[in-house]
Amino acid sequence: MFKNNKPPKYGNLVTILSLDGGGVRGIIGGVILANLEKHLQEIDNDESVRLADYFDVIAGTSTGGLMTAMLTAPNDSGRPLYAAKDIVPFYLEESPKIFYGSKWWDPSALWALFRPKYNGEYLHTRLGEILGETKLDQTLTNVVIPTFDIKKLQPTIFSSYHASVDPSLNAKLSDICIGTSAAPFYLPPYKFPENDKMRTFNLIDGGVTANDPTLVGMTAMSRKSIIKHPDMDGFKPLEYEKYIVISIGTGSAKREEYYSAVEAAKWGFENWAYNWKHKTTPILDIIFESSRDMVQYHTSVLFQALESEDNYLRIDADTLKKDEVFMDDSETLNLENLKNIGEKLLDTNVMRMNLDTYTYEPIPKTVNNDQELKRFAKILSDEKKLRNKTFKTMIDDSSNS
């Protein structure tokens, strides 16, 4: 399905956009997405173009899954429901209604010891209003959204490819978004459909599977090559040097130190689940961070081995403070601060993972993230034009024969 973008077989590259999970920290990613879309509009001199017009796959986990749906679900005119510039205002308005009373010193938050901190009712209702009956196979470009099924104890990956071969996976986007956002401790697991005669899903946050869904998105296109799907004619399954990947994070406090083995040796179940001293959820944080870090490590190794490091752009802020990383802090001051962090990140030098230390370091070239986004936007624009030209030539040749 390439409704707005001709498939890779008409061009030279495979283009992928990946969006991390992170709750309200999705605001950081929203700022980056808005700038990328603005660059594309400027390069192509067309304010109507959208990100879905340029990417073969948009992959998103948790809050990234929600952004994926916003960017790819069609409106009544067959265009994306939201422009990238609409994401941050959406989060600023809706986050306080989803994560109500989010401060830990609010006595009402104590009930999270016995049930999910939030009931999720507003999120469920709002997603239903926005996405309606739109199903996975109706998105304007391919999407991949990871979740985890707690009944089967295995990942469930919702993708355009899977939806095309297995009707039971062609679920409503609203259901998929609710499932991938159901972070343990914060929001209740989500079951759908209610009719047990059909295949049912019992889902929690996709972050326990792939908080950074970059490799999931790349694999989705590789799988098409393996089965020799016509969209991927001319591409071998492992030709990742022909992939253009933009991966956008939601921030972390990597420069901060957290727990010591001496301290954790005294913990029982309660402190691992929620640590009152640090006001954190250690086991959940560890799962999400390790999931994300390993994806970034393997992706970095892959592109380095192929001598194609310039094809992979990872934009993330690892300098957040501990009180800035809460996925549910919906206080106005925090939300505005996250927006400012995203804007400052654009002016920050491009970073790449040091494969020995797992930390991010500036690349030798002095170039900031916004400049690199503009370079990638030019590549995306050129690829789109090439595909359109090739397609038109083939149609013209066919008509003349």
UniProtKB/Swiss-Prot annotation:
The UniProt entry's sequence similarity note says: Belongs to the patatin family.
**What GO terms describe the biological role, i.e. biological process, of this protein?**
defense response; lipid catabolic process
Which InterPro entries does UniProt cross-reference here? Acyl_Trfase/lysoPLipase (IPR016035), PNPLA_dom (IPR002641)
Q: What is this protein called?
A: Patatin-like protein 4
Function noted in UniProt: Possesses non-specific lipolytic acyl hydrolase (LAH) activity. Hydrolyzes phospholipids as well as galactolipids. May play a role in disease resistance.
SUPFAM superfamilies membership: FabD/lysophospholipase-like (SSF52151)
UniProtKB keywords: Hydrolase, Lipid degradation, Lipid metabolism, Plant defense, Transferase
Residues annotated as catalytic: 62, 205
Give all residue intervals belonging to the PNPLA domain. 17-218
Q: Which organism is it from?
A: Arabidopsis thaliana
KW Transferase (keyword) present = yes
Q: Which GO molecular function, any one, fits this protein according to its record?
A: hydrolase activity
From the UniProt annotation, give the residues forming the signal peptide: none
